[in-house]
Amino acid sequence: MTAILDEVATLNLLTELEPVVEKELNRHIAIAKEWFPHDYIPWDEARNFAHLGGKDWTPEERRFSEAARTSLIINLLTEDNLPSYHHEIATIFGRDGAWGEWVGRWTAEEGRHGTAIRDYLVVTRAVDPVELER
């Protein structure tokens, strides 16, 4: 029973915050600079993998510490899990209103983060691309 009351209180709070969300979303849209993941990838460091006549990844190609690699992979997993976050928020608030617009923009932005992280890790051979996809 307490969990249900907590959910109702949270929903009421989020609904009450919608005017603030709308104001801040509009402010963000006015100052945000559009960016694209491909602009931040060092493509000139890329090489084909064995399937295309290149060389498969080897552990010697790692370029970051274990902590940095783990951090980037966990961040990527979080970005890849976005559809479930989007679904939860969109189910509650729908597509209309400030929360609906925010969740759509947030999902797109986080999707770009995921694309940039994955491309960077694979292009620079910082991680085993096969293990990354498993």
Enumerate the language-model features and the residues they cover:
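Terminal targeting/low-complexity segments that flank the catalytic cores of oxidoreductases
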Residues: 1-100, 123-134
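Alpha-helical transition-metal enzyme core signature, strongest for iron centers
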Residues: 75-83, 106-121
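Tryptophan-centric aromatic hotspots in well-structured domains and transmembrane helices
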Residues: 95, 99-111
